[in-house]
């Protein structure tokens, strides 16, 4: 079940409490999205995974707050806000823009000397070193943004039919695209933990851009393909969650076997 935490930590508006949890899974949304995109995940994940959807400023419960202007600022502030929650085993998942944020968080925690995630899941995103700077070119007006929403899929039809909902969606999407356009990759040392890429077969991200994530992984690297386009995580939700569950289960076993025996 969910416990609202918005008055304590605005980045984590709802926390999936499970007394049997062995690992926390922080989930970061795509451009234009919010924590609610993960609302159905809790009931489909096992009790040993505690789901922690991340809410970015300027949307849903944080609609009254100004949208972020810099990805690094988001990473730094979010990293600070979850420090008390990463002392226990955890993993990071991010889709599209959220994948960049999840990667940035893992790197930030490492640079701070803090615990590292057991695993990083990056979904529907080219590696930071291989992002296409032309992908978002021209997406700076309502007509272009609406066309992009329709092409990407994943936006409910009722959003297009409601002027109010559409306005909110376009404003958040435009702010997030500005955030992404300002992103510049600066080479970093590989991360020390496993990295798992999830991708849609019909997405327009070239496979070489996905495989380039391996350069970021100092630990094990894996890539899973799913039927569908950019929002395959909705079209194939059950398969995506089963993949995450299996990967985390194996990783917990590896870590427990590698831990020194108690004296």
Task: Locate the predicted segments by residue.
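Domain-scale detector for complete catalytic domains at protein termini or as standalone homologs
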Residues: 2-93, 100-263
